[in-house]
């Protein structure tokens, strides 16, 4: 099975508290007839305490329409993309020319040539690098991207591939729109980038990981030491066991963009938590293919759509209270980063202590990546350590 070898994240240098951003928006919009009570209630309801922004806050007032916003997006997206991929390659000491596939995903700006093509002029990839730009999947593209790269590596098991996500949601803000959806969006979404290195199971890096896993398992078998069990956890990388796509018919108006002459206007319906609460049969069906139940999953990496969505997923799957607190913390500290969020959560997971193995009969640790987005749809990826 394909394996996730390493992850990296990058953020703009500009970080602001929610109070700072709300105050600036309130001051600008009150001149346009803003209902301050509604604004304050919605800004507080998203539970975000701070976010990274692509530009200094004062620069947003100078942007005049989609052309300015998209140009700013392209500049910062390339800077973050170059930084996060360079960091990823440095972590693994893997030369850029050994990467065979580069998949990029974004939904917050438009570029032709696309981001990964432009990055080939900044990073020493091979000229025959295969490139796949994703656009339109929105928030679920981080999980979907992992799934599609893993599908590719099953066909090319001796290769290495990178998934890049760059989302600069702040540059889609509609400055003249006082709708509830835009007010929520203005308080919910942040900016950032993430990259993930995956390899097929015949790649040298995968073999190194597998050898380390086997050696530590053998040591534990003969010594029975919990200390060595923890060492095994630290050395093993997750395998991408499988993926599942879920589509809810006749729901295209629930979430997405309304593409206007002023740019990308948020479409955000009230039905998102309702769809989130309907995930259980789909997740259970997916897990049953591997003889697993919900209680066998010890690592949940769920996209932070918003506090109501997180609560709906947790209750809908009948997960123990606080199971998704990692996601809540992410939302609180840096907001919803669209497709980048779940990859940032993956990075935090792989670089921190993992929960104990769940399920009395489980030998391995299982994790679930779960994201929802436009269409309305969801994407699941099952991980195995």
Question: Where in the sequence are the language-model features?
Answer:
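Condensing-enzyme catalytic core mediating Claisen C-C bond formation in acyl metabolism
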Residues: 1-75, 160, 169, 175-277, ...
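Short coil/turn connectors at secondary-structure junctions
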Residues: 1-2, 96-100, 127-130, 155-161, ...
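Conserved beta-ketoacyl condensing-enzyme motif
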Residues: 42, 46-125, 131, 136, ...
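A short glycine/serine-rich beta->alpha loop
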Residues: 68-72, 104, 131-134, 181-183, ...
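Phosphate/pyrophosphate-binding loops at sites that engage ATP/ADP/AMP, CoA/4′-phosphopantetheine
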Residues: 84-99, 281-298, 317, 349-357
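Claisen-condensing/thiolase-fold acyl-transfer catalytic domains that form or cleave C-C bonds
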Residues: 108, 121, 126-128, 133-154, ...
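Active-site-adjacent elements of ketosynthase-type condensing enzymes
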Residues: 111-117, 163-184, 242-259, 306-315, ...
């Amino acid at each position: 099975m394909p394996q996730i070898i390493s992850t990296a994240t990058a953020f703009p240098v500009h970080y602001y508290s929610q109070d700072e951003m709300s105050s600036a928006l309130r001051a600008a919009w009150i001149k346009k007839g803003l209902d301050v009570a509604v604004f304050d209630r919605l800004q507080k309801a998203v539970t975000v305490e701070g976010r990274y922004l692509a530009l200094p806050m004062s620069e947003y007032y100078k942007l005049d329409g989609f052309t300015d916003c998209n140009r700013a997006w392209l500049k910062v997206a390339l800077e973050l993309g170059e930084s996060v991929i360079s960091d990823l390659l440095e972590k693994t000491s893997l030369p850029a020319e050994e990467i065979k596939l580069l998949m990029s995903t974004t939904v917050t700006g438009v570029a032709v040539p696309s981001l990964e093509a432009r990055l080939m002029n900044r990073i020493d990839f091979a000229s025959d690098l295969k490139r796949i730009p994703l656009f339109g999947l929105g928030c679920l593209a981080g999980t979907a991207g992992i799934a599609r790269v893993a599908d590719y590596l099953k066909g090319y098991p001796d290769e290495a591939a990178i998934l890049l996500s760059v989302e600069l949601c702040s540059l889609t803000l509609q400055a003249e729109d006082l709708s509830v959806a835009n007010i929520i969006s203005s308080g919910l979404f942040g900016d950032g980038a993430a990259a993930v290195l995956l390899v097929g199971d015949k790649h040298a890096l995968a073999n190194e990981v597998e050898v380390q896993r086997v050696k530590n398992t053998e040591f534990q078998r003969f010594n029975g030491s919990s200390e060595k069990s923890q060492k095994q956890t630290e050395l093993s990388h997750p395998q991408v066991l499988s993926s599942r796509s879920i589509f809810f018919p006749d729901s295209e108006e629930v979430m997405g963009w309304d593409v206007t002459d002023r740019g990308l206007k948020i479409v955000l319906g009230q039905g998102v938590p309702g769809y989130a609460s309907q995930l259980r049969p789909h997740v259970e069906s997916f897990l049953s293919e591997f003889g697993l139940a919900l209680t066998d999953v010890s690592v949940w990496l769920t996209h932070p759509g918003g506090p109501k969505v997180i609560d709906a997923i947790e209750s809908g799957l009948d997960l123990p209270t606080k199971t998704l607190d990692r996601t809540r913390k992410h939302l609180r500290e840096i907001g919803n980063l669209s497709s980048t969020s779940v990859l940032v959560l993956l990075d935090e997971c792989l670089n921190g202590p993992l929960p104990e193995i769940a399920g009395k009969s489980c030998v391995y640790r299982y994790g679930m990546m779960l994201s929802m987005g436009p269409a309305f749809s969801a994407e699941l990826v099952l991980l195995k350590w």
